[in-house]
């Protein structure tokens, strides 16, 4: 390796905020099912604590050995609606508390998998779990929840969409003392993936191995710096530059994943190629798009710039890693990106533009604060729009929206840490209530029939 490459890597880490965003251990809980809920919870706690006991220590050891910052160590588990569904319990909040206790015991900052997959309909476990989400998120610190309401193969479960509007509203009310923080830990998906290492949407799919390590990388600052060097050049050059940069970023993720896998004695799963921003200056996806020539993110051309970025990151990343997966797209969470926050405050970026950007990226309406008086039906209609984009385009889409109690347009909602600060954005004031009240299922698109 040449000296300039070593120096480049050091500069990426020290100046351009290159890091590993998360090492996530996926743990199957299928062997923890029991007719007695209390017995099942004991098995769950024991398995998580046993499998993940050394996860944080290994992450810290890799960090110091290679000098690579590893921001989060996390756990994802089999959707609890499946596991708890075999018990006679009529409320699953105690399962959420068990996950929370296990997460605290092993020292991870989040545990995902308080989840239900209802794209085609509900089981008993799904019904109970979804009903319990607001209380579960209000009574735990580290538990993350997700619900899959649609897929390209099955269409959109509009009964679930309607219910999730109500669940988000109730969660915001129950966590009003933290400005609706519970909603920041709740994601509604279409086409959810089984190996996502990022929160809050991570769960461990039933088709996965018993235990696996997945890695999420992050390097918006590195990509922006690379594009600065090709100012004024045609898009072919920009795409090639992003590709080469993504290759280097992903190589680091591959290395960390393999080393963690060996040290923990657990198979290595995937590297998620998503570019994940943080509220820190110099760690923004919005600023990458602006570096391409946009005065401010949200103006005309934003969707095209995002398309170039997303595709080039994937092309470079795929070459660098044996197995890629997860969401693998650019994240555009408003509260977690300094450039997005500024664009909303300046009036350049609105919900409609973010919805258009969903056609390109992994999670569209992400970490968005809306007024506290936004109705459950309006929230459900936002979910339906996002799910439709995912289902029709055969891609993952999601909504993480916070109707922070007592807030109005222009207020700021403070979450702190990686979750950042969200400006409260206006929503369309015309009603979607009669549309959402219909219920039933929106059928799968014609091009879903591939067999």
UniProtKB/Swiss-Prot annotation:
It comes from the Bacteria. Gene3D superfamilies: 3.20.70.20. InterPro entries: UPF0210. Pfam families: DUF711. Homodimer. Belongs to the UPF0210 family. NCBIfam families: PRK05313.1. This is UPF0210 protein lwe0494.
């Amino acid at each position: 390796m040449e000296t300039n490459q070593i120096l480049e890597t050091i500069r990426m880490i020290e100046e351009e905020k290159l890091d590993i965003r998360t090492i996530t251990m996926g743990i199957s809980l299928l062997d923890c099912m029991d007719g007695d809920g209390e017995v099942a919870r004991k098995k769950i706690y024991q398995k998580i604590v046993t499998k993940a006991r050394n996860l944080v220590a290994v992450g810290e050891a890799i960090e110091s050995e290679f000098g690579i910052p590893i921001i989060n160590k996390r756990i994802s588990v089999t959707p609890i609606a499946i596991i708890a569904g075999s018990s006679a319990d009529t409320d699953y909040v105690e399962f959420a508390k068990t996950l929370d206790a296990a997460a605290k015991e092993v020292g991870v900052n989040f545990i995902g998998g308080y989840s239900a997959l209802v794209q085609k309909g509900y089981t008993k476990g799904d019904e109970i779990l979804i009903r319990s989400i607001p209380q579960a998120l209000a009574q735990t610190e580290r538990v993350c929840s997700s619900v899959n309401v649609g897929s390209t193969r099955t269409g959109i479960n509009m009964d679930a969409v309607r219910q999730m509007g109500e669940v988000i509203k109730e969660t915001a009310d129950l966590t009003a003392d933290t400005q609706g923080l519970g909603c920041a830990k709740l994601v509604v998906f279409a086409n959810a993936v089984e190996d996502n290492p990022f929160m809050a949407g991570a769960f461990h799919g039933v088709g996965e191995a018993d235990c696996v390590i997945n890695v999420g990388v992050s390097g918006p600052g590195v990509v922006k710096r690379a594009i600065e060097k090709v100012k004024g050049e045609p898009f072919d050059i920009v795409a090639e530059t992003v590709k080469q940069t993504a290759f280097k970023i992903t190589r680091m993720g591959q290395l960390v994943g393999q080393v963690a896998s060996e040290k923990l004695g657990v198979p290595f799963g995937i590297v998620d190629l998503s570019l994940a921003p943080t509220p820190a200056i110099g760690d923004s996806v919005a600023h990458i798009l602006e570096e391409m020539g946009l005065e401010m993110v949200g103006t005309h051309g934003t969707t095209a710039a995002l398309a170039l970025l997303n595709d080039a990151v994937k092309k470079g990343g795929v070459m660098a890693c044996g197995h890629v997966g997860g969401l693998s797209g650019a994240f555009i969470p408003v509260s977690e990106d300094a450039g997005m926050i500024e664009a909303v405050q300046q009036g350049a970026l609105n919900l409609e533009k973010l919805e258009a950007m969903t056609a390109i990226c992994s999670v569209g309406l992400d970490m968005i604060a809306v007024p506290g008086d936004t109705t459950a039906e309006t929230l459900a209609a936002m979910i339906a729009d996002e799910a439709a984009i995912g289902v029709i385009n055969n891609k993952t889409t999601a909504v993480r929206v916070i109707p922070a109690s007592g807030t109005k347009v222009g207020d700021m909602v403070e979450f702190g840490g990686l979750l950042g600060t969200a400006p409260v954005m206006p929503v369309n004031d015309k009603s979607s209530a009669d549309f959402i009240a219909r219920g039933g299922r929106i059928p799968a698109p014609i091009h879903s029939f591939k067999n």
